[in-house]
Amino acid sequence: TVIDTDDELIAYLKNKLQRFVFLDEHVALPIKVEYGTPKTLGKDRLAAVVGANYLRPGKNLLVIDAGTAITYEVIEAPGIFLGGNISPGMTTRFRALNHFTKKLPLVTEEDDIPLIGRSTETAIQAGVVNGIVYEMDGYIDELKVKYPDLLVFLTGGHSFYFERRLKNSIFADINLVLTGLNRILEYNVED
């Protein structure tokens, strides 16, 4: 997530704390970042990448974070963050269909999603959910062509909803961002 920071608060914390690590584009990281615009890179995306690389070092990795947006982050062995893709998340897609059309209702996900919708509501659910599943599996399949040994992490608020729907093997880790934040902190305070 990219947010504005309170410079006054940061100055106060730096003054009051013995050690203060602020996650920005200048912080030391245990991975190499080849992302073209590090200043605009979401801190959650960066932390998830660091977390995945910490859990499976030296591997080719794809991190899928399924939340408000769905992000796809590629880490090439031995720990090079190449970049990724961003698409609308499930709730965002449901809301967009409702907001940008005149008559489509706002629906939410259900446990049982048909392949073919039999009503407007189930057609929206099937379109959104199955579309995301095909998108995720599509990215995984394409990356496995280049990286046959690819390991995939799935995290984010909707990760458990999608983990059982994907045809590809994945590691679901709801705490991947927190793992990455902790690793960044450790990396910056090691003596």
PLM segments and residue spans:
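Short beta-strand scaffold segments in enzyme catalytic cores
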Residues: 70-75
